[in-house]
Amino acid sequence: MAFKLVDKVLSFMGFEEEVVEEEEKRARDEIVEEQPWQRKKEKDRGAVLSLHAQRQVRVVVVEPRAFDEVQGIADNLKNRRPVIVNLEQAEPDLAKRIVDFISGATYALNGSLQKVGSGIFLFVPNNMDIASDLKDPQKEKGIFTWMRS
């Protein structure tokens, strides 16, 4: 009877719950120890990152025929894809508008551009650099000399 009185007092003070929690914790620890070592290894393997994995870069090549296509080109730059724009077949006024728009989008995205050839431009987002041995188009007589024919 005295034992039940002590249990009631301990229960009233909240000590009985701690004993139950400790027993449950021990039971959980025993269950974890009983699990095979392979499961722990599989869990740990998920947190490992390969530092040498490289993401493939897709270069988009476009030959716009209308000014309506420039938004799609700018969207590719926003998605961090380099874009080669071929304007050799475009009318000079349309080509100028397209280059102006895409140049502005490239500048806004902190990207860069390079004239590759007559009417061909390379626009890259800010996560890429252009390494080139080509002459700088600004060093020529005009920035868009290909349009003066």
Curated annotation (Swiss-Prot):
Intracellular or extracellular location(s): Cytoplasm
Keywords: Cell cycle, Cell division, Cytoplasm, Septation
InterPro entries per record: Cell_div_SepF (IPR023052), Cell_div_SepF/SepF-rel (IPR007561), SepF-like_sf (IPR038594)
Superkingdom, taxonomy of origin: Bacteria
Keyword Transcription carried by entry: no
One GO term of the biological process aspect: FtsZ-dependent cytokinesis
Keyword Cell division: yes
Cellular compartments per GO CC: cytoplasm
Main location: cytoplasm
Similarity-based family: Belongs to the SepF family.
Described purpose of this protein according to its UniProt entry: Cell division protein that is part of the divisome complex and is recruited early to the Z-ring. Probably stimulates Z-ring formation, perhaps through the cross-linking of FtsZ protofilaments. Its function overlaps with FtsA.
Name by which UniProt lists this protein: Cell division protein SepF
Organism field: Pelotomaculum thermopropionicum (strain DSM 13744 / JCM 10971 / SI)
